[in-house]
Amino acid sequence: LSRADAGTFLRYEHGGEQVIGVMAKDSTNNYYCIESGERVEYQLGESVKLRDDDTARRLGWLMDHYRDGTAAEHAAIAVLAHDLLDLKPDTWKSRRVSVMRDNPTLRRKVEQMWEEAGSNAPANATVTRTYAEGTRTGRVTVSVTNAQGKTIAGIKYAATLNGPAVFANGSATVTGISGAEPIVYSWKATGEGEVKASVAYDRKQVDVF
């Protein structure tokens, strides 16, 4: 790992000058601290996937969406990471006061970005299957929703038929990007037997080192 670039963090005073934002980087990723008061080590240990819940999906979405963001945006992500994951919450609590004192507009930025992530981070994908008995054909409808149950666009997915059937492309799998409305695919049976459908979608995850 290498040091964070200028313009990816904000400064504040807390027993000396400190920074809040990106703490380290590699060729593709930014890294944020979740252990207040500890010195940054520019080495990666073993990684663990953060639990797959709404918090992880929102943070993952923010880290990906604002990969090339402003100093304030990176600082807001860092604040959220500390708020939700810090291993020393009492230490972070006092530091947070200093962060907000020296960066008074950051509080609203944190709130806005968390709300934005809630609207855009995928929480669920649904697929429904219909079948016309006489023609041995059917349709699969795919949609991706956020934590509020609203359909969201721009999420990569793959829908798969489980059974003797293919989509119009001749394959049992179709891939696409979700839209603001559900997307419908036609399929036809290729033999006898039940046909079911499943869907997998792209959701960003957070690695903890």
Placement of each model-derived feature along the sequence:
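Short, surface-exposed polybasic-aromatic patches that bind anionic ligands, especially phosphate groups
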Residues: L1-G118
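Beta-strand-rich structural segments
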Residues: G134-K150, V195
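Short beta-strand element of the conserved SAM-dependent methyltransferase core
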Residues: V142-V144, L161, I183-A189
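Beta-strand elements of well-folded, non-transmembrane domains
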Residues: N146, L161-A165, Y201-Q205
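Low-complexity "stalk/linker" and mucin-like segments enriched in Ser/Thr/Pro/Ala/Gly
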Residues: I152, K156-A180
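Short, hydrophobic beta-strand segments
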Residues: T175-G193
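Enriched for extracellular/lumenal, surface-exposed ectodomains of secreted and cell-surface proteins
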Residues: G191, A197-F209
